[in-house]
Swiss-Prot record:
Region (5 X 8 AA tandem repeats of P-H-G-G-G-W-G-Q): 54-95
Annotated binding of Cu(2+) 1, by residue: H64, G65, G66
Record organism: Rupicapra rupicapra (Alpine chamois)
Lipidation (GPI-anchor amidated alanine): A233
Keyword Ribonucleoprotein belongs to the record: no
Protein name, per record: Major prion protein
Domain of life: Eukaryota
Leader sequence residues: 1-24
Positions annotated to bind Cu(2+) 2: H72, G73, G74
GO cellular component assignments: Golgi apparatus; plasma membrane; side of membrane
Ranges of the Sequence repeats in the UniProt entry: 54-62, 63-70, 71-78, 79-86, 87-95
Disease annotated for this entry: Found in high quantity in the brain of humans and animals infected with degenerative neurological diseases such as kuru, Creutzfeldt-Jakob disease (CJD), Gerstmann-Straussler syndrome (GSS), scrapie, bovine spongiform encephalopathy (BSE), transmissible mink encephalopathy (TME), etc.
Residues given in the record as Cu(2+) 4 binding sites: H88, G90, G91
Amino acid sequence: MVKSHIGSWILVLFVAMWSDVGLCKKRPKPGGGWNTGGSRYPGQGSPGGNRYPPQGGGGWGQPHGGGWGQPHGGGWGQPHGGGWGQPHGGGGWGQGGSHSQWNKPSKPKTNMKHVAGAAAAGAVVGGLGGYMLGSAMSRPLIHFGNDYEDRYYRENMYRYPNQVYYRPVDQYSNQNNFVHDCVNITVKQHTVTTTTKGENFTETDIKIMERVVEQMCITQYQRESQAYYQRGASVILFSSPPVILLISFLIFLIVG
């Protein structure tokens, strides 16, 4: 008896759900469609009328005479006369006043300095025998032991380089050789380049510049050494027999 009651309730619930789904499918969408009597803009016409009710004169959609969509006369889409797309008269299409070139997007300007800097950082510099140009660095804070040189450096640090030239670390036996070569080529290149622009360096400038570039070359050596050892460790890891066997097994599973 209980089972029959449960079965009856399940049947009633199923029929009710099925009826609700059918009603949802047949239920019309609110707002009305094209010429269904609705209005997309309430208060602009009587029910069942046009979507854009006339406001006197002209044909359907002609507020002040003229063709369709002509508020003040003119061709199609001409608010104040003129060719299509001419808000206030003028020449041909797209030549309406100050907006004459709106349909022609302006070409983006390429900042050649940024392109050159991005291409040069870490790349081999032509004409320097395999030297590379490092990334830009913040100029280090250095104390030179006397107030005059400290103040001179703070006032003139923008005149000193913020990038160094160097060769790969695997071409040097130790850090001192790398730094010595890095300082010489960087100071030389910066001095020659700046001198050609009409700016000369004093003995104080050269002394301070060598100290600044030395610190930057040490930083560059540490970066390059770390990257070099990481690359070497990766090669050793992936060249070991267990790793090769594991990779081969995974490839076999994927392909097979």
